[in-house]
Amino acid sequence: MFPKPLVILAHEIYGVNSHMKKMGRLIKMAGYDVLTPNLLGEDEVYTLKEEKTAYEQFTKHERLKTGETIIQNVIRQNAGRHIFVIGFSVGATIAWKCSSMPEVSGSVCYYGSRIRDSLHHMPACPVLLFFPNYEPSFDVALLIKKLREKQHTHLEIYQFDALHGFANPDSVYFNRALFFKTLSIIKNGAESRLRTVSSSFF
């Protein structure tokens, strides 16, 4: 009997907050195993109001780099089962980079701003990118244009009329309808991927 597919959640700069816990519960209800590694210090977590401090700590301790290593190690430790990585913001950049690993069946990236620094990356599995309409730190439309010019076979890009945080129930920019729309897209993509992979064994 095959083990359940595994979803690894890569959190934002805030740590394993209530948003990540809610997301984990939703994914478990859908029949998946879930792991949410803490990419910060032990029990370190920030509220959305502590964004400045969270960002300073994340940058100071180079947690994008160490976080990528942590997620990659978790992936390797669970090799042999279907693994999906879902990341938010900086976690989305990690999910994007992990999509080249042979152990990964699919990656989902919510508003991954730093993907713009890794345009050379070549996904080896299906990847879903969810972007807002606007980001203060970069030109979303330009990034999408550059990604589409790469003509990645496995890449699907969605841009919504919403702002960063539209998939976070704790954010003032939360958009319930769009959030559940993305969950539907993820569910359909994951089920399609599992059917495709499973059929190759029979």
Curated annotation (Swiss-Prot):
One function term, GO molecular function aspect: hydrolase activity
Origin: domain of life: Bacteria
Database matches in InterPro entries: AB_hydrolase_fold, Dienelactn_hydro, Dienelactone_hydrolase-like
Keyword tags: Hydrolase
UniProt xrefs under PANTHER family: ALPHA_BETA-HYDROLASES SUPERFAMILY PROTEIN (PTHR46623:SF6), CARBOXYMETHYLENEBUTENOLIDASE-RELATED (PTHR46623)
Recorded family membership: Belongs to the dienelactone hydrolase family.
Name of the featured protein: Uncharacterized protein YczH
High-level lineage: Bacteria, Bacillati, Bacillota, Bacilli, Bacillales
Gene label: yczH
